[in-house]
């Protein structure tokens, strides 16, 4: 039997011979302390212990050890930076978003500087209207034209609480978000006479995480809850999100409402379209829609179509009382196909 032995080290130099042993850091992974400003280098030494003795084996022969190997060095740089919003990003004292300029500042931190704001809390303090030239939050790392399965994806990963305020998208404008990863958007009202895309998140795409490796785990995409599509709103594509992602990139949509008078698919030329989602993997629960949905193929009252075949696509305790019009084939009152 082979048993791995792990030991993590840290150093102020990029050198595996000058590190200091980290007491208790003996697992395959290690989460460093990021509360202090500065640059620290981390690496792990691994050695395998062989244990194949029985009760007749002499004590000194019961264990043998393989050669020690060392991991690559991981650089962790912690920078103390003040942000332009009131609050500190905690659940009890979230960053306060009062104006469109606050949203623009958030976008620049994500799209230009690569901040993800993992688990940081933001709260809208009033109604906000996006400008007609709004560029959504979330993009690709500088110098990269493709996400490479998430490796070069600069996505928002925080928690946005709309606090029951209304976000209005300009006529013909783009939605609030482009790319998100493990984000939460909640307690928000959405409006826009003609939103040129999806209503909330414009890019639902394959995301295997920051290393782009499926085998190390795939993040969920978003949890969307208590979001209301207000009467008079219309979208070119699905009302919240859609696209084609990995089956493991789950989206949870819960307690969401689309009022009567909402139009989904105002051109009538889109396929894979529904009130809340287009191509979709995840769960919709406790949602209701009275919207009018137009499309060509795979047009559904709540969901256009199941996305990746191996992923989930579940709708529970939800209803559709609106109208679905499909000029092609595959249409349904709940899911198109």
Descriptions of predicted regions:
Residues 79-337:
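Surface-exposed repetitive/solenoidal architectures
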Residues 1-80:
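Ser/Thr/Pro/Gly-rich low-complexity disordered regions
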């Amino acid at each position: 039997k082979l048993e791995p032995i792990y030991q993590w080290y840290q150093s102020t130099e990029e050198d595996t011979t000058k590190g200091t042993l980290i007491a208790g850091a003996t697992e395959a992974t290690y989460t460093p302390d990021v509360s202090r400003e500065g640059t620290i280098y981390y690496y792990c030494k691994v050695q395998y212990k062989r244990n194949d003795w029985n009760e007749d084996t002499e004590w000194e022969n019961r264990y043998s050890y393989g050669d020690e190997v060392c991991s690559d060095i991981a650089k962790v740089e912690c920078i103390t930076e003040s942000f332009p919003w009131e609050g500190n990003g905690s659940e009890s004292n979230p960053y306060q978003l009062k104006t469109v300029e606050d949203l623009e500042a958030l976008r620049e931190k994500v799209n230009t500087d690569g901040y993800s704001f993992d688990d940081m809390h933001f709260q809208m303090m009033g109604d906000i209207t996006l400008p007609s030239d709004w560029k959504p939050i979330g993009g690709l790392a500088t110098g990269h034209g493709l996400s490479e399965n998430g490796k070069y994806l600069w996505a928002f990963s925080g928690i946005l609480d709309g606090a029951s305020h209304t976000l209005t998208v300009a006529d013909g404008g783009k939605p609030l978000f482009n790319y998100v990863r493990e984000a939460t958007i909640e307690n928000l009202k959405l409006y826009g006479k003609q939103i040129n895309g999806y209503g909330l998140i414009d890019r639902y795409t394959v995301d295997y995480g920051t290393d782009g490796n499926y085998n190390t785990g795939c993040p969920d995409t978003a949890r969307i809850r208590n979001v209301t599509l207000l009467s008079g709103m219309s979208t070119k594509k699905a009302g919240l999100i859609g696209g084609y992602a990995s089956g493991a990139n789950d989206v949870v949509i819960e307690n969401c409402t689309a009022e009567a008078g909402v139009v989904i698919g105002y051109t009538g030329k889109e396929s894979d379209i529904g009130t809340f989602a287009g191509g979709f993997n995840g769960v919709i629960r406790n949602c209701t829609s009275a919207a009018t949905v137009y499309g060509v193929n795979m047009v559904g009252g709540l969901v256009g179509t199941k996305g990746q075949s191996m992923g989930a696509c579940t709708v529970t305790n939800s209803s559709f009382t609106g109208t679905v019009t499909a000029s092609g084939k595959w249409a349904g009152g709940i899911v198109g196909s």
